[in-house]
Amino acid sequence: SKSSTETPPSYNQLNYNENLQRFFNSKPITAPVDVDPHEVEQSYDASTDARSFRSPLRHFEGSGGSGSSGNFNSGSNLHIGSITNTSNTGTGTSSGSVQLITLTESLLN
């Protein structure tokens, strides 16, 4: 039997396949297949993106365990602060090893 504390699925979870089908039936405008990934990569400003990505994590650093940040204790605050990723700051995908693909309905089936 299921636990009484289990959250029932939401409307969106129950209708995921229908929502996905409706999305593809609407024929959304997508990027052309001949887009050069290197051009897209060069226009990406990694330093701006890195700042916006790290800012929520900085909010938790050193916030203390007195309940000032909701239900976190000081151990979780230290853990959250320690996951800030600075190894790729400002580099984007410099190696070019990540291949961009266009999401199509056939890939999902």
UniProtKB/Swiss-Prot annotation:
<keyword id="KW-0090">Biological rhythms</keyword>
<feature type="region of interest" description="Disordered">
    <location>
        <begin position="29"/>
        <end position="100"/>
    </location>
</feature>
<keyword id="KW-0539">Nucleus</keyword>
<dbReference type="GO" id="GO:0048511">
    <property type="term" value="P:rhythmic process"/>
</dbReference>
<protein>
    <recommendedName>
        <fullName>Period circadian protein</fullName>
    </recommendedName>
</protein>
<comment type="function">
    <text>Essential for biological clock functions. Determines the period length of circadian and ultradian rhythms; an increase in PER dosage leads to shortened circadian rhythms and a decrease leads to lengthened circadian rhythms. Essential for the circadian rhythmicity of locomotor activity, eclosion behavior, and for the rhythmic component of the male courtship song that originates in the thoracic nervous system. The biological cycle depends on the rhythmic formation and nuclear localization of the TIM-PER complex. Light induces the degradation of TIM, which promotes elimination of PER.</text>
</comment>
<dbReference type="GO" id="GO:0005634">
    <property type="term" value="C:nucleus"/>
</dbReference>
<keyword id="KW-0597">Phosphoprotein</keyword>
<dbReference type="GO" id="GO:0048471">
    <property type="term" value="C:perinuclear region of cytoplasm"/>
</dbReference>
<comment type="subunit">
    <text>Forms a heterodimer with timeless (TIM); the complex then translocates into the nucleus.</text>
</comment>
<keyword id="KW-0963">Cytoplasm</keyword>
<keyword id="KW-0677">Repeat</keyword>
<feature type="compositionally biased region" description="Low complexity">
    <location>
        <begin position="69"/>
        <end position="97"/>
    </location>
</feature>
